[in-house]
Amino acid sequence: MNIEEMKKIAAKEALKFIEDDMVIGLGTGSTTAYFIRLLGDMIKKGEVSDIVGVPTSYQSRLLAIESGIPVATLDQVDAIDVAVDGADEVDPNLNLIKGRGAALTMEKIIESRAGMFIVLVDERKLVDYLCQKMPVPIEVIPQAWRAIVEELSIFNAEAKLRMGVNKDGPVITDNGNFIIDAKFPRIDDPLDMEIELNTIPGVVENGIFADIADIVIVGTKEGVKTLER
């Protein structure tokens, strides 16, 4: 089973948690894209009804509309029943690093308010500790990026401004901000680090999602496995 197949089976497993009349937070990224398309197929087949999606990015909003999912913004709904998204890393306590898609701020806003937060990953994303493989994305006010990179050196982080692909200059988030990718030696206390990073002036939000995931669905070569907090 290849990586894309692992992503697909994880996305398909998440559909088991979807019921009629749900408001669903729709994450951003390649694995979540499979879920959005499959959810759209369920709606078209009449297998589920009265679904509203709350996208975390323009990308997921466009895909949801294309897939036939009614969409709304966060301020148009009373509550989020379930949120579904991917992750860049998952540690043994189900703490996450997210934000390779540069949508981390809205992802955290929506997913922290969900009645249930389901994370979809392939087996490569499971790590022994956060920052084992991937840096922590940090959304920052553009004028503050250089000062923040300097301040991150206190944490022995290798930090750099994320540059765009197929465009000149830095990546610009949906909120009009920059992304700094910070590679720490390791993160042993994700919640403490998440809080501390957000105290740096100019930081909008960071990609550590501590104590927030309820269920992690993992696509593996042998099939699907589900991890619960």
Swiss-Prot record:
- Reaction it catalyzes: aldehydo-D-ribose 5-phosphate = D-ribulose 5-phosphate
- Pfam family of this protein, just one? Rib_5-P_isom_A
> What organism is listed for this UniProt entry?
Pyrococcus abyssi (strain GE5 / Orsay)
Write out the catalytic residues in the record: E107 (proton acceptor)
A single Gene Ontology CC term: cytosol
Q: Does the keyword Acetylation apply?
A: no
Tell me the protein's name.
Answer: Ribose-5-phosphate isomerase A
Question: Known EC number(s)?
Answer: 5.3.1.6
- The organism's superkingdom is given as Archaea
Q: Name one GO biological process term.
A: D-ribose metabolic process
What GO molecular function terms would the record report?
ribose-5-phosphate isomerase activity
Q: Which residues bind substrate?
A: T28, G29, S30, T31, D85, G86, A87, D88, K98, G99, R100, G101, K125
